[in-house]
Structures are given as C-alpha cells and as structure tokens.
Amino acid sequence: MVKGVETKTIVGLEVGTSKVVVVVGEVFPDGVVNVLGVGSCPSKGIDRGSITDLDAVVGSIQRAIEAAESMADCQIMSVTLAITGEHIQSLNESGFVPIAESEVTQEEIDSALHTASSIKLPEGLSLLHVIPQEYAVDRQMNIKNPLGLQGVRLKAQVHLIACHQDWQNNLKKAVERCGLQVDKVVFSGFAATHSVLTEDEKDLGVCLIDFGAGTMNVMVYTNGALRFSKVIPYAGNIVTNDIAHACTISRAEAERIKVNYASAFYPARLHGDKKIEVASIGGRAPRSLTKSDLSLITSARYTELLGVVKDELDKLKAELEAKHIKFELIAGVVITGGGAQIEDLKECASNVFHCQVRIASPLNITGLTDYVNRPQYSTVVGLLQYNYSNSDDDLISGSDDSEGTFFESIWQGVKKIVNKVRSEF
C-alpha cells in the first residue's frame, strides 16, 4: 500500500551535470538522517547549473523521483532543491542596531541580521542564505550569541549567498512540471557542509571542496563561521574531455575509463602497468594504454583544478590578513562529491595544499546507508540536514525591499529609545 510522505519526512533533490539524485529520509532530534529511499539517474539537459533542455531535465527528474518513491514506498509531493552554477555569488556584510533597553533582545538580533542582509544586490540576483558569523556589542568582539549582553550598539556580521533569479526560476519550473512543490532552495555547497563537516573542523578552520562533474563548490570556515563560498565552473568533465581528445575516443568511453582507471597522481600508485583497452571511434581498431599512461593525462588536470582552489585560498588569506584577521586551515581540506572518488586524489591534493586532506562521505546517517555512504550523495543528504536544522527564511523574506528593511530596523530601535526616555519622566 503506497502511503503519503509524512510531514517529518524530508525529500532532497539535486539536479547535477552528470546525475539527478533524490533521497527520502527523516531526521532524528540528534541530527542523524534515517534514509528511507534513494533514486538516481543520468542527468540530461543541464550543464553546470544552467538548463539547456527543459523537457530533458523534467524527464530526468521524473525518473529519479519514481525510483525514490518505489524504494521508500511513498508518494513524493515536495522537495528541498539544491542549486549551483557560476551565477552563485557571495559576500560578507555587517549590520548595526541600537540596543534600546541596555540588554540585547532576540528582536534586536533579528533586526541586526536583517540590516546586514538588506544591501542592494546586482540586478537579477536573489538572496538565498543569510548566515550569521559573529556579533559585537560595543567593543566586545567575536561574540557567538549576544542575547542578554549589555551595551549600546549591536553589530551582526553575516555571510550572504545569492543566485540569479532566472536560473533559480528555471530549475524550479522543471521541478514543478513534475507535479512537485519546492519547499526550499539551498546552495549545493552549503548543503554539503551540513553532511560532511564536523563542528570541530569548522572551529579549527577547514576548506570544503564539493567536486562535481560541472562545478567545484568551495566553502571555507574559520572560527566556526562560514567566511567564503564560491562556485568554480570547471570540474570532472574537463578531465573526461582531456581523455577523449588525447585518446581520440567518445566522451562516453572517456568517462568510463576515467571512472574505472583514472588516477590523480603520476605515476599511478596502484597497478600502474595494468593494460586498459580503449574502444576507438569510427570503426577503428581498439587500442590499449597502461594505467600510468592514463595518469599522465589525468594527474596534470586534477593538479590544475585543485590549483585553482589553492589560488582562491591564497587570495582569501591575503584579504583577511589585510584586515588583521587570522587565517588558518588547521583542519585542512575536505573533498567530497562525485569527483572525489578518483584514485589518489587525496595524495594529489596533499601536494597542492600542503596540509592534511580528507575524502568525505555523508556523516550521521542510518537506514539505507549502503546506498548513500559515498561522496556523491553528500549534497543531497545535506539537504535533509539543512532543512531540519536551519531556517533563514525569515531573514530572507524581507530582503527584496532592502531599503524598507534597513530603515524599519533603525526606526524600531529609535522608537524603543524614545519610549524608554518617556517612561523615565
């Protein structure tokens, strides 16, 4: 008997460049995800977050949804949707409000966050996330929770993530054409942080690389707060193209060879002399090459891709240190996503970043763990954890009228001070 999804059950949907993935699960009070169903199918009609064929995307989503419904024995009505692409932009902002009653209230915290998020975004962009970093009360800095503290002025520091409205609308349209409602839209990289990073790693300083087929999502935490997020529009598909061009083979054959035999280190550390038979195009006779020969092609590109991330980290370090902010990634680099499964990637990354590296799969999962205990499921599992533990919807809901939000926050603070003065006379 098919049953409807209960309210406590959450469905995550990721429409990636290479695959569409759906996970049905419930999140326990301790944050553990109980996986009830999984659906996955090759993705068509989308490239690096941009829809190129709406009908093809709809068909891919429907197949993945049907597979998840069959496994979970339920009917999916709504989803939490992941979004990525080079249109994603982020920045750090701050907002100030006066403290009316000398003691910080929750309303004043919310007002400070609203003020910080009320900047005028470039035309076409829509705010996705308002993520608090820390607060300051007068000269007391680096406060994680200012509630109840005494002072005159409250400052909120936040990390903002925005996306292009048209890209988001097109992706939502594809989902809605499948008869589904979109509950929330979440940046893929931010979702992945919920499933693979520990609080200790965030406190010590860590860089997460969500390595996909079309994009790499880069997230940097220091002192427990998200400081940097960026989408790099190059990833695993470039390696596939390199193999196809070097060996004069189809992209499908190149992808098969990459997944089964590629190494990110030269020479390949395991079975380097293994012969690989390559199916040529145009009726030509098959050829063969060794695994080490292949690694000469692939290792150079993986080193280059990770080097792009290293350059971003170097720029971030310089910017923060110019502001006298200490930048240390004591917990190193964590790599997840489908591209993280390439052999020897950990060793390659260690050479590039000169720090400890961890290849990560989703943490805190139970139920059908055999299906999702792999790096390519980190984002979609993270969607469930984000949906359960986060709600910045209230902060975002008023962000379209940024001017109104700003002056409303100031006016509310002024009214409180005036009322306090009146009460004393």
Curated annotation (Swiss-Prot):
Protein family per UniProt: Belongs to the FtsA/MreB family.
Keywords: Cell cycle, Cell division, Cell inner membrane, Cell membrane, Membrane
Membrane association type: Peripheral membrane protein
GO cellular component, one term: cytoplasmic side of plasma membrane
Role noted for this protein: Cell division protein that is involved in the assembly of the Z ring. May serve as a membrane anchor for the Z ring.
Subcellular location: Cell inner membrane
Keyword Cell membrane tagged: yes
Protein name: Cell division protein FtsA
Quaternary context: Self-interacts. Interacts with FtsZ.
Alphabetized InterPro entries for the sequence: ATPase_NBD, Cell_div_FtsA, FtsA/MreB, SHS2_FtsA
Classification via Gene3D superfamilies: 3.30.1490.110, 3.30.420.40
The species this protein was found in: Haemophilus influenzae (strain ATCC 51907 / DSM 11121 / KW20 / Rd)
CDD domains the UniProt entry points to: ASKHA_NBD_FtsA (cd24048)
GO terms (BP aspect): cell division; FtsZ-dependent cytokinesis
Keyword RNA-binding: no
Domain of life: Bacteria
